[in-house]
Amino acid sequence: MSPRSADPGVRMALLETAARIIATEGLGKLTLRRLAHEVGTSTMAIYTHFGGMTELRREIRREGFARLGARQAAVDTTGDPIADLCVLGWAYYRNAIENPNLYQAMFMDGPIDEADAGVGLDTFGQLVTTVQRGIGSGRLDPADPVGLATQLWALIHGLVTLELARLLSPDQVRACLDDGARNLITAFGDDPRAFGRSLTRATDRSSRPAIRAKPVSAVDIAGSSSYRG
């Protein structure tokens, strides 16, 4: 089977199955034979599609960031950059929850090497650009746009990771996303009342995950003995 005749369905099955093995069992459990067996193909198919396991693992990361980038790119740019920041955060959350194995595998396979140094920069750049629009609108402190974007990314990534590990429930995470964004964005200069109005506008847009529970406090989290999904 030549690269030209390679089946894209098999390629995606290899990527998603490899991501599941890495995410649920660890990188050490991913082998050529096991992957080929679970997908129902030959080990040669892995070489046909990826050239080997090293490139397959790189493609998992690239595919994960490609899906994240597409999800974020679908977020409309409006006249309210703070609302846009909130919707970008929810888009990140939804992408991770809908692609849990791929998302976890993206960050479990060690540091990004020089060959993939640019992977993920586009998705982070979308966040930085939106923060810069907030600065341009006069609502955010102009001192450190990259710093705010980094802290927002860390907030969302950390909460998503806790949910995927079943240490926090979806409702707890969704409430903390809003509270954490409020705390960070107002700390970087936004007026709390203006943020509240932006959050309301963002809530009216379709990307927001529903929150059914009241916001969770540190006492609630400490008192929860286990996740109840």
Segments the model singles out, each with a brief description of its role:
Residues 1-9, 192-229:
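N-terminal intrinsically disordered/low-complexity leader segments
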Residues 13, 17, 23-55, 59:
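Helix-turn-helix
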Residues 95-114, 161-167:
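Amphipathic alpha-helical segments used for helix-helix packing
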Residues 73-102, 124, 149-152:
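Hydrophobic alpha-helical connector segments
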Residues 95, 112-137, 146-151, 175-186:
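Amphipathic alpha-helical packing segments from all-alpha helical-bundle domains
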Residues 22, 56-64, 106, 110:
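Alpha-helical DNA-contacting segments of helix-turn-helix folds
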Residues 62-85, 117-121, 130-132:
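Amphipathic alpha-helical linker/stalk segments
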Residues 98, 133, 153-171, 185-197:
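Amphipathic C-terminal alpha-helical segment
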